[in-house]
A protein has these predicted regions:
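An interfacial alpha-helical scaffold signature
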Residues: 1-232, 236-253
C-alpha cells in the first residue's frame, strides 16, 4: 500500500500536535507533523509534485493557510508545490536541519516581512531633468527646425542623454529611500524590478514592535517624494525573502 503523501505549507515552532480549523488543498484538513519543538504544517494530498498544478484556486488555498497561521505563529513558509511522499522522511529532515530551522525561527520571531515597491512618475522625472540640464530642452527645440536625417541624429543623442540622466536619477532616489527604510528594518533584500518604471522592489524584515514606526516612515517618504515617485506598501507577507525552506526540505520530493 502506497504511503500517504503530504502537502507542506510551512514549519512553525510548537511542541504540541495540532489540528487546525483550516481547509487545505483538495479540501483536506491541516495538521502538524512534529519533531521536538518544531513542526511541519501539512495536509494529505493525492497528487505528486509533478501533478500539483499552480491553479488560481490552489495558490489561493496555500496563501490563505499561511496567512491564518501567521496570526499566531512564527512561520517559515514553503513555496507552492512542496509535497512529501514519506512521513518518515519528512520527520528525518526536521531532525537533520533542526538547528538551522531553529535559527530561522529565532530570526523571524516577533518580526514581519513587508514589501515595498517604488515606481517613478515619468512626467515629473522628465520635468526635473529638463530643469536641471538645459541641454535637453535645447535639443528638443533644435529638432523642430531640422531636416529629418539631422533630426534623427539629434534624437539619438537626446535618447542617450536621457538614458544616462534617468539612471543617475533612479540611483539617487533608490539609494535615499532604501537607506532610510533600513534605519528601521532589521534586514532588507533588493529584488529585480518588475517593469521599467519600478525602481525599487524590496522586502524588509521589521520588528512588530516597530511596525508603526515603519508605517510612519513610508508616509513621510511618500509625502517628501510623492510628486516624483509612487509607493506600493504591502504587509504582512510570508517571509519568503528571509528563509529558503525548500533548500532544506527539497529532499522530500
Amino acid at each position: 500500500m502506497a504511503e500517504q503523501k503530504r502537502y507542506i505549507y510551512c514549519v512553525i515552532p510548537t511542541n504540541q500536535e495540532r489540528k487546525f480549523d483550516l481547509v487545505g488543498l483538495e479540501g483536506e484538513k491541516v495538521y502538524t507533523m512534529n519533531y521536538r519543538d518544531i513542526a511541519a504544517v501539512v495536509s494529505n494530498i493525492s497528487l505528486s509534485y509533478e501533478e500539483c498544478d499552480p491553479t488560481r484556486r490552489n495558490m489561493k488555498t496555500h496563501t490563505l493557510v499561511l496567512e491564518a497561521l501567521m496570526k499566531d505563529h512564527t512561520v517559515l513558509p514553503a513555496r507552492f508545490g512542496l509535497i512529501s511522499d514519506s512521513g518518515d522522511k519528512l520527520r528525518e529532515l526536521l531532525q537533520k536541519y533542526y538547528p538551522t530551522l531553529k535559527d530561522y525561527i529565532k530570526k523571524l520571531d516577533n518580526r514581519m516581512e513587508v514589501g515595498v515597491k517604488v515606481f517613478w512618475e515619468k512626467e515629473a522625472m522628465i520635468a526635473e531633468l529638463e530643469g536641471k540640464d538645459q541641454r535637453l530642452t535645447k535639443i528638443k527645440e533644435e529638432i523642430k527646425t531640422l531636416s529629418l536625417p539631422i533630426a534623427e541624429q539629434k534624437l539619438v543623442k537626446a535618447g542617450e542623454m536621457v538614458r544616462s540622466m534617468i539612471e543617475k536619477w533612479v540611483d539617487r532616489y533608490t539609494g535615499r529611500v532604501y537607506l532610510e527604510l533600513m534605519k528601521i528594518a532589521v534586514d532588507g533584500k533588493k529584488n529585480y524590478p518588475i517593469d521599467i518604471k519600478n525602481i525599487i522592489n524590496s522586502a524588509f524584515l521589521v520588528d512588530k514592535a516597530r511596525e508603526k514606526d515603519f508605517d510612519a516612515l513610508i508616509d513621510k517618504l511618500d509625502s517628501e517624494y510623492g510628486d516624483k515617485i509612487n509607493f506600493k506598501y504591502v504587509k504582512p507577507i510570508p517571509p519568503y525573502n528571509f528563509v529558503n525552506l525548500e533548500l532544506y526540505l527539497k529532499e522530500v520530493l
